[in-house]
Regions:
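Conserved substrate/cofactor phosphate-moiety recognition/catalytic segment
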Residues: 52-90
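Extreme N-terminal, non-catalytic leader segments
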Residues: 5-31
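Glycine-rich phosphate-binding loop used to anchor ATP phosphates in small-molecule kinases
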Residues: 79, 83-145
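NTP-dependent small-molecule kinase module
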Residues: 165-174, 181-237
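Conserved lysine of the Walker
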Residues: 43
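A glycine- and Lys/Arg-enriched "phosphate-lid" helix/loop adjacent to the NTP-binding pocket
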Residues: 117-188
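Hydrophobic anchor at the beta1->P-loop junction of P-loop NTPases
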Residues: 35
């Protein structure tokens, strides 16, 4: 793992780079940031961009390694429990590696928040399966690193569905808009009550954090100013 690079944002003009570095020098930057949000909202893209911009280590979910995922999207009722447990064990392993990693590593960015894990389980599992999942979850989540900042990306369900269609992932083709609506509602409910860490809620419906440099830079500047409590980033057209 590399140390934090205090000169940070790549692919930006020199004046902005200097300004962001000056802003950052005035604050205590979060040592662990978790980016969250429903399928298609762009959490992995943002996590990767932030990690690259500031030369930080990044922890990413690996859905392509979950052998149950494709079967789950074809038949959620039959394959919900194994797909959920596989993701849980994968996320736990990554966080345990983070805890045991280089003590000098200053910043990590992940595209998941382990506290949110039961959200998917509650949506997809029946009551008996959920009780089994919850028993496993509660036994293995102890003593894990907690983020210093959670960034929750939001978008309307229609926008999420359109983004999924546009990116053309074969595994995701069976995903219905109604399922995305269930997940979106569950995320909204979860983060409405979430207060365990500082939280930045970002409305992504009219911005493009993947390819629009101005949208991305403006969000980075807002992140640099985010300290404690709950914050909302809601850019206007």
């Amino acid at each position: 793992m590399e140390r934090t690079n205090c000169l940070g944002v790549m692919k930006m003009n020199d004046n902005l780079l200097i300004n962001l570095d000056l802003e950052r020098s005035k604050i205590s930057f979060p040592s662990y940031i978790a980016v969250e949000g429903p399928i298609g909202v762009g959490k992995t893209t943002l996590a990767k961009r932030l990690a690259k911009s500031f030369n930080y280590d990044v922890l990413l979910e690996e859905p392509e390694t979950n052998p149950f995922l494709e079967r789950f999207y074809r038949d959620r009722r039959t394959h919900a429990l194994p797909v959920q447990l596989h993701f849980l064990f994968q996320r736990i392993q990554k966080l345990q590696n983070l805890r045991q990693g280089d003590i000098f590593q200053q910043v990590q960015i992940s595209d998941f928040l382990i506290d949110k894990d039961p959200l998917f389980a509650r949506v997809t599992l029946d009551d008996d399966e959920y009780r089994l999942y919850q028993t496993v979850y509660e036994k293995i989540i102890t003593d894990l690193p907690r983020p210093d900042l959670v960034i929750y990306l939001q978008a309307p369900t229609a926008t999420l569905f359109e983004r999924l269609q546009r990116r053309g992932n074969e595994i995701e083709k069976p995903v219905e808009e109604s399922y995305l609506q269930q997940l979106n509602d569950a995320y909204t409910q979860f983060f409405y009550h979430y207060d365990d860490t500082p939280l930045l809620i970002v409305n992504t419906s009219i911005i493009n954090l993947a390819t629009n440099e101005s949208d991305y830079i403006n969000l980075v500047k807002y992140i640099l100013q985010t300290q404690s409590g709950r914050h909302y980033y809601n850019p206007q057209p």
